[in-house]
Amino acid sequence: MPKMKTNSGSKKRFALTGTGKIKRKHAFHSHILTKKSKKRKRNLCYSTTVDTTNVSQVKELLAMK
């Protein structure tokens, strides 16, 4: 059976950390920023980890399963 292909959109959006967690960026930080507060925009610019409920789905997209 051939190898699973990695989803091209996923490999651009997710990254693995050294401990094996999956890193992602926040949404809602690309346009229509005038009505959003400085605090909200600042918090959206930091990256975070994928929630544990979605890890298996993301790993499947990244062909890690």
UniProtKB/Swiss-Prot annotation:
One Gene Ontology CC term in the entry: cytosolic large ribosomal subunit
One of the protein's GO biological processes: translation
NCBIfam families the record matches: rpmI_bact
Gene that this polypeptide is encoded by: rpmI
InterPro entries: Ribosomal_bL35, Ribosomal_bL35-like, Ribosomal_bL35_CS, Ribosomal_bL35_sf
Protein name: Large ribosomal subunit protein bL35
Pfam families assigned: Ribosomal_L35p
Family to which this protein belongs: Belongs to the bacterial ribosomal protein bL35 family.
GO terms of molecular function: structural constituent of ribosome
Transmembrane residue ranges: none
Region (Disordered): 1-40
Keywords: Ribonucleoprotein, Ribosomal protein
Biased segments, Basic residues type: 21-40
